[in-house]
Amino acid sequence: MAKIVECIPNFSEGQNQAVIDGLVATAKSIPGVTLLDYSSDASHNRSVFTLVGDDQSIQEAAFQLVKYASENIDMTKHHGEHPRMGATDVCPFVPIKDITTQECVEISKQVAERINRELGIPIFLYEDSATRPERQNLAKVRKGQFEGMPEKLLEEDWAPDYGDRKIHPTAGVTAVGARMPLVAFNVNLDTDNIDIAHKIAKIIRGSGGGYKYCKAIGVMLEDRHIAQVSMNMVNFEKCSLYRTFETIKFEARRYGVNVIGSEVIGLAPAKALIDVAEYYLQVEDFDYHKQILENHLLG
Protein backbone atom coordinates (compact mmCIF):
# COMPACT_ATOMS: atom_id res chain seq x y z
CA MET A 1 0.00 0.00 0.00
CA ALA A 2 1.23 3.50 -0.85
CA LYS A 3 1.99 5.72 2.09
CA ILE A 4 -0.17 8.85 2.01
CA VAL A 5 0.96 12.11 3.58
CA GLU A 6 -0.89 15.41 3.80
CA CYS A 7 0.98 18.71 3.58
CA ILE A 8 -0.65 22.03 4.49
CA PRO A 9 1.77 24.88 3.70
CA ASN A 10 0.67 28.38 4.73
CA PHE A 11 1.88 31.22 2.52
CA SER A 12 2.05 34.91 3.40
CA GLU A 13 0.09 36.00 0.36
CA GLY A 14 -3.67 36.41 0.13
CA GLN A 15 -4.04 39.46 -2.09
CA ASN A 16 -1.89 39.08 -5.21
CA GLN A 17 -3.84 36.68 -7.40
CA ALA A 18 -0.95 36.20 -9.81
CA VAL A 19 1.26 34.84 -7.03
CA ILE A 20 -1.56 32.64 -5.71
CA ASP A 21 -2.13 31.28 -9.22
CA GLY A 22 1.58 30.55 -9.46
CA LEU A 23 1.47 28.56 -6.25
CA VAL A 24 -1.50 26.60 -7.57
CA ALA A 25 0.31 25.86 -10.84
CA THR A 26 3.40 24.74 -8.94
CA ALA A 27 1.37 22.40 -6.74
CA LYS A 28 -0.38 20.87 -9.74
CA SER A 29 2.87 20.34 -11.62
CA ILE A 30 4.32 17.73 -9.23
CA PRO A 31 3.63 14.10 -10.24
CA GLY A 32 2.17 11.95 -7.50
CA VAL A 33 0.64 14.88 -5.62
CA THR A 34 -2.95 16.12 -5.60
CA LEU A 35 -3.95 19.65 -4.62
CA LEU A 36 -7.13 19.01 -2.65
CA ASP A 37 -7.93 22.57 -1.64
CA TYR A 38 -6.60 26.09 -1.25
CA SER A 39 -8.08 29.21 0.27
CA SER A 40 -6.90 32.80 0.44
CA ASP A 41 -7.87 35.61 2.79
CA ALA A 42 -7.12 39.21 1.88
CA SER A 43 -7.41 40.54 5.44
CA HIS A 44 -5.07 37.89 6.79
CA ASN A 45 -3.00 38.24 3.59
CA ARG A 46 -2.47 34.51 3.75
CA SER A 47 -3.21 31.38 1.72
CA VAL A 48 -3.54 27.83 2.99
CA PHE A 49 -2.96 24.90 0.63
CA THR A 50 -3.83 21.25 1.25
CA LEU A 51 -1.98 18.59 -0.72
CA VAL A 52 -1.73 14.82 -0.46
CA GLY A 53 0.76 12.45 -2.01
CA ASP A 54 3.10 9.58 -1.40
CA ASP A 55 5.97 10.03 1.02
CA GLN A 56 8.46 10.95 -1.73
CA SER A 57 6.34 13.13 -4.02
CA ILE A 58 5.01 15.22 -1.14
CA GLN A 59 8.56 16.22 -0.23
CA GLU A 60 9.24 17.50 -3.73
CA ALA A 61 5.95 19.39 -3.80
CA ALA A 62 6.65 21.06 -0.46
CA PHE A 63 10.11 22.14 -1.54
CA GLN A 64 8.99 23.52 -4.90
CA LEU A 65 6.19 25.51 -3.26
CA VAL A 66 8.56 26.97 -0.68
CA LYS A 67 10.97 27.83 -3.51
CA TYR A 68 8.25 29.58 -5.53
CA ALA A 69 7.09 31.50 -2.47
CA SER A 70 10.64 32.60 -1.65
CA GLU A 71 11.05 33.96 -5.17
CA ASN A 72 7.69 35.75 -5.38
CA ILE A 73 6.76 36.93 -1.87
CA ASP A 74 8.67 39.81 -0.29
CA MET A 75 8.13 39.85 3.46
CA THR A 76 9.53 43.37 3.78
CA LYS A 77 6.35 44.55 2.01
CA HIS A 78 3.91 42.18 3.70
CA HIS A 79 1.04 43.45 5.83
CA GLY A 80 -1.80 41.32 7.16
CA GLU A 81 -3.82 40.51 10.26
CA HIS A 82 -2.41 37.02 10.78
CA PRO A 83 0.92 36.50 12.59
CA ARG A 84 3.69 35.44 10.20
CA MET A 85 7.45 35.12 10.00
CA GLY A 86 8.12 33.95 6.46
CA ALA A 87 6.96 33.78 2.86
CA THR A 88 6.14 30.17 3.63
CA ASP A 89 5.16 30.70 7.23
CA VAL A 90 4.64 27.08 8.22
CA CYS A 91 4.82 23.74 6.42
CA PRO A 92 3.33 20.81 8.37
CA PHE A 93 3.21 17.15 7.35
CA VAL A 94 0.34 14.96 8.57
CA PRO A 95 0.20 11.14 8.45
CA ILE A 96 -2.92 10.00 6.59
CA LYS A 97 -2.58 6.34 5.57
CA ASP A 98 -0.03 3.57 6.16
CA ILE A 99 2.52 5.96 7.60
CA THR A 100 3.47 6.90 11.15
CA THR A 101 3.97 10.24 12.80
CA GLN A 102 7.64 9.40 13.27
CA GLU A 103 8.02 8.81 9.53
CA CYS A 104 6.48 12.24 8.95
CA VAL A 105 8.98 13.68 11.42
CA GLU A 106 11.78 12.29 9.25
CA ILE A 107 10.12 13.71 6.13
CA SER A 108 9.92 17.13 7.77
CA LYS A 109 13.61 17.04 8.66
CA GLN A 110 14.62 16.08 5.12
CA VAL A 111 12.53 18.87 3.62
CA ALA A 112 13.76 21.38 6.20
CA GLU A 113 17.40 20.54 5.50
CA ARG A 114 16.89 20.92 1.74
CA ILE A 115 15.06 24.23 2.08
CA ASN A 116 17.90 25.67 4.10
CA ARG A 117 20.66 24.16 1.97
CA GLU A 118 19.26 25.22 -1.41
CA LEU A 119 17.27 28.36 -0.56
CA GLY A 120 19.11 29.75 2.46
CA ILE A 121 15.96 30.05 4.58
CA PRO A 122 16.45 29.36 8.32
CA ILE A 123 14.17 26.60 9.61
CA PHE A 124 12.61 25.90 12.99
CA LEU A 125 11.30 22.38 13.56
CA TYR A 126 8.00 22.46 15.47
CA GLU A 127 5.19 20.27 16.87
CA ASP A 128 6.17 16.57 16.82
CA SER A 129 9.44 17.42 15.04
CA ALA A 130 10.53 19.94 17.68
CA THR A 131 14.03 19.55 19.07
CA ARG A 132 13.08 21.06 22.43
CA PRO A 133 9.77 21.43 24.29
CA GLU A 134 9.34 25.18 23.82
CA ARG A 135 9.47 24.74 20.05
CA GLN A 136 6.46 22.44 19.91
CA ASN A 137 4.14 25.44 20.07
CA LEU A 138 4.10 27.38 16.80
CA ALA A 139 3.00 30.56 18.58
CA LYS A 140 6.20 30.56 20.65
CA VAL A 141 8.33 29.90 17.59
CA ARG A 142 6.65 32.67 15.61
CA LYS A 143 6.62 35.22 18.46
CA GLY A 144 8.23 38.42 17.23
CA GLN A 145 7.08 37.75 13.67
CA PHE A 146 9.12 38.64 10.60
CA GLU A 147 10.13 42.05 11.90
CA GLY A 148 11.46 40.66 15.18
CA MET A 149 13.20 37.57 13.82
CA PRO A 150 16.64 39.15 13.19
CA GLU A 151 16.97 39.85 16.92
CA LYS A 152 15.27 36.62 18.02
CA LEU A 153 17.67 34.41 16.07
CA LEU A 154 20.55 35.97 17.99
CA GLU A 155 19.07 34.98 21.36
CA GLU A 156 20.76 32.07 23.13
CA ASP A 157 17.75 29.74 22.96
CA TRP A 158 16.58 30.56 19.45
CA ALA A 159 19.21 29.38 17.01
CA PRO A 160 17.43 27.82 14.01
CA ASP A 161 17.44 24.04 13.70
CA TYR A 162 18.76 24.50 10.18
CA GLY A 163 20.71 27.52 9.02
CA ASP A 164 22.60 30.46 10.42
CA ARG A 165 21.32 33.03 12.89
CA LYS A 166 20.30 35.32 10.04
CA ILE A 167 16.93 35.54 8.33
CA HIS A 168 16.47 35.34 4.59
CA PRO A 169 16.18 39.03 3.59
CA THR A 170 12.83 38.65 1.81
CA ALA A 171 11.58 35.12 2.61
CA GLY A 172 12.17 35.33 6.36
CA VAL A 173 11.99 32.14 8.43
CA THR A 174 9.90 28.98 8.03
CA ALA A 175 8.59 26.43 10.54
CA VAL A 176 8.50 22.82 9.34
CA GLY A 177 7.21 19.84 11.28
CA ALA A 178 4.97 16.83 11.65
CA ARG A 179 1.65 17.00 13.47
CA MET A 180 -1.74 15.37 13.72
CA PRO A 181 -4.75 16.83 11.85
CA LEU A 182 -6.11 20.12 13.17
CA VAL A 183 -9.09 22.29 12.32
CA ALA A 184 -8.60 25.97 11.50
CA PHE A 185 -11.81 27.52 12.82
CA ASN A 186 -12.66 31.22 12.96
CA VAL A 187 -15.61 32.96 14.61
CA ASN A 188 -16.76 36.44 13.53
CA LEU A 189 -18.15 39.06 15.93
CA ASP A 190 -20.51 41.94 15.17
CA THR A 191 -18.06 44.53 16.46
CA ASP A 192 -15.10 46.44 15.12
CA ASN A 193 -13.51 46.49 18.59
CA ILE A 194 -10.44 44.28 18.27
CA ASP A 195 -9.89 44.40 22.04
CA ILE A 196 -13.02 42.30 22.55
CA ALA A 197 -11.69 39.61 20.21
CA HIS A 198 -8.34 39.70 22.03
CA LYS A 199 -10.03 39.27 25.42
CA ILE A 200 -12.20 36.37 24.26
CA ALA A 201 -9.24 34.65 22.59
CA LYS A 202 -7.23 34.94 25.79
CA ILE A 203 -10.05 33.30 27.77
CA ILE A 204 -10.54 30.29 25.50
CA ARG A 205 -6.96 29.40 24.53
CA GLY A 206 -5.04 26.86 26.53
CA SER A 207 -2.16 29.19 27.36
CA GLY A 208 -4.62 31.57 29.03
CA GLY A 209 -6.22 28.92 31.20
CA GLY A 210 -8.89 27.94 28.70
CA TYR A 211 -9.12 24.85 26.53
CA LYS A 212 -5.86 22.93 26.38
CA TYR A 213 -6.15 21.99 22.70
CA CYS A 214 -7.28 25.39 21.45
CA LYS A 215 -4.94 28.09 20.16
CA ALA A 216 -6.67 31.43 19.64
CA ILE A 217 -5.90 35.02 18.71
CA GLY A 218 -8.01 38.07 17.99
CA VAL A 219 -7.71 39.62 14.54
CA MET A 220 -9.40 42.44 12.65
CA LEU A 221 -11.00 41.85 9.25
CA GLU A 222 -10.42 45.31 7.84
CA ASP A 223 -12.36 44.69 4.63
CA ARG A 224 -15.50 43.75 6.62
CA HIS A 225 -14.90 46.06 9.61
CA ILE A 226 -15.41 43.23 12.09
CA ALA A 227 -13.30 41.49 14.71
CA GLN A 228 -12.63 37.77 14.60
CA VAL A 229 -11.49 35.07 17.01
CA SER A 230 -9.13 32.93 14.92
CA MET A 231 -8.40 29.43 16.24
CA ASN A 232 -6.42 26.30 15.58
CA MET A 233 -8.12 23.29 17.16
CA VAL A 234 -5.14 20.98 17.53
CA ASN A 235 -7.15 18.04 18.89
CA PHE A 236 -10.82 18.31 17.96
CA GLU A 237 -11.64 15.03 19.71
CA LYS A 238 -10.57 16.45 23.07
CA CYS A 239 -11.74 20.01 22.42
CA SER A 240 -14.67 20.16 20.01
CA LEU A 241 -15.66 23.01 17.74
CA TYR A 242 -19.08 23.39 19.36
CA ARG A 243 -17.51 23.85 22.79
CA THR A 244 -15.33 26.75 21.71
CA PHE A 245 -18.14 28.21 19.60
CA GLU A 246 -20.57 28.22 22.53
CA THR A 247 -17.93 29.64 24.86
CA ILE A 248 -17.22 32.49 22.46
CA LYS A 249 -20.94 33.28 22.25
CA PHE A 250 -21.18 33.23 26.04
CA GLU A 251 -18.17 35.47 26.57
CA ALA A 252 -19.21 37.89 23.80
CA ARG A 253 -22.52 38.59 25.55
CA ARG A 254 -20.77 40.34 28.43
CA TYR A 255 -19.70 43.01 25.91
CA GLY A 256 -23.12 43.20 24.23
CA VAL A 257 -21.67 41.49 21.16
CA ASN A 258 -23.13 38.69 19.04
CA VAL A 259 -21.52 36.01 16.90
CA ILE A 260 -22.47 36.62 13.26
CA GLY A 261 -20.75 33.71 11.55
CA SER A 262 -17.89 31.27 11.47
CA GLU A 263 -15.62 29.64 8.92
CA VAL A 264 -13.50 26.55 8.52
CA ILE A 265 -10.23 27.24 6.70
CA GLY A 266 -8.99 24.50 4.42
CA LEU A 267 -10.06 20.91 4.89
CA ALA A 268 -11.36 19.39 8.10
CA PRO A 269 -11.85 15.77 9.20
CA ALA A 270 -15.49 14.71 8.78
CA LYS A 271 -15.70 13.63 12.40
CA ALA A 272 -14.97 17.17 13.60
CA LEU A 273 -18.09 18.43 11.84
CA ILE A 274 -20.22 15.38 12.64
CA ASP A 275 -19.50 15.99 16.33
CA VAL A 276 -20.96 19.48 15.95
CA ALA A 277 -24.10 18.15 14.26
CA GLU A 278 -24.49 15.44 16.90
CA TYR A 279 -24.31 18.05 19.66
CA TYR A 280 -26.79 20.55 18.21
CA LEU A 281 -29.26 17.86 17.04
CA GLN A 282 -28.95 16.08 20.40
CA VAL A 283 -28.67 12.74 18.60
CA GLU A 284 -28.86 9.83 21.02
CA ASP A 285 -26.55 6.81 20.82
CA PHE A 286 -24.98 7.98 17.57
CA ASP A 287 -22.25 5.75 16.12
CA TYR A 288 -19.96 7.65 13.76
CA HIS A 289 -18.44 4.51 12.24
CA LYS A 290 -21.72 2.67 11.64
CA GLN A 291 -24.19 5.44 10.81
CA ILE A 292 -22.29 7.55 8.28
CA LEU A 293 -23.07 6.33 4.76
CA GLU A 294 -19.78 7.52 3.29
CA ASN A 295 -17.80 5.52 5.84
CA HIS A 296 -19.29 2.33 4.40
CA LEU A 297 -18.83 3.41 0.78
CA LEU A 298 -15.18 4.31 1.35
CA GLY A 299 -14.47 1.14 3.29
Swiss-Prot record:
It catalyses: (6S)-5-formyl-5,6,7,8-tetrahydrofolate + L-glutamate = N-formyl-L-glutamate + (6S)-5,6,7,8-tetrahydrofolate + H(+); 5-formimidoyltetrahydrofolate + L-glutamate = N-formimidoyl-L-glutamate + (6S)-5,6,7,8-tetrahydrofolate; (6S)-5-formyl-5,6,7,8-tetrahydrofolate + ATP = (6R)-5,10-methenyltetrahydrofolate + ADP + phosphate. InterPro entries: Formiminotransferase_C, Formiminotransferase_C_sf, Formiminotransferase_cat, Formiminotransferase_N, Formiminotransferase_N_sf, FormiminoTrfase_cat_dom_sf, FTCD. It is found in: Cytoplasm. It comes from the Bacteria. GO terms for cellular component: cytoplasm. Its EC number is 2.1.2.5, 6.3.3.2. It holds the Pfam family FTCD_N. The active site is at residue 82. One of its GO terms (molecular function) is glutamate formimidoyltransferase activity. NCBIfam families: FtcD. Belongs to the formiminotransferase family. Coiled coil: none annotated. One of its GO terms (biological process) is L-histidine catabolic process to glutamate and formate. Pathway: Amino-acid degradation; L-histidine degradation into L-glutamate; L-glutamate from N-formimidoyl-L-glutamate (transferase route): step 1/1; One-carbon metabolism; tetrahydrofolate interconversion. This is Glutamate formimidoyltransferase. Its main location: cytoplasm. Keywords: Cytoplasm, Folate-binding, Histidine metabolism, Ligase, Transferase. It comes from Streptococcus pyogenes serotype M1. Folate binds at residues 163-172. Catalyzes the transfer of the formyl group from N-formylglutamate to tetrahydrofolate (THF) to yield 5-formyltetrahydrofolate (5-CHO-THF) and glutamate (Glu). The triglutamate form of 5-CHO-THF (5-CHO-THF-Glu3) can also be used as substrate. It can also catalyze the transfer of the formimino group from N-formiminoglutamate to tetrahydrofolate (THF) to yield 5-formiminotetrahydrofolate (5-NH=CH-THF) and glutamate (Glu). It can replace YgfA to catalyze the irreversible ATP-dependent transformation of 5-CHO-THF to form 5,10-methenyltetrahydrofolate (5,10-CH=THF).
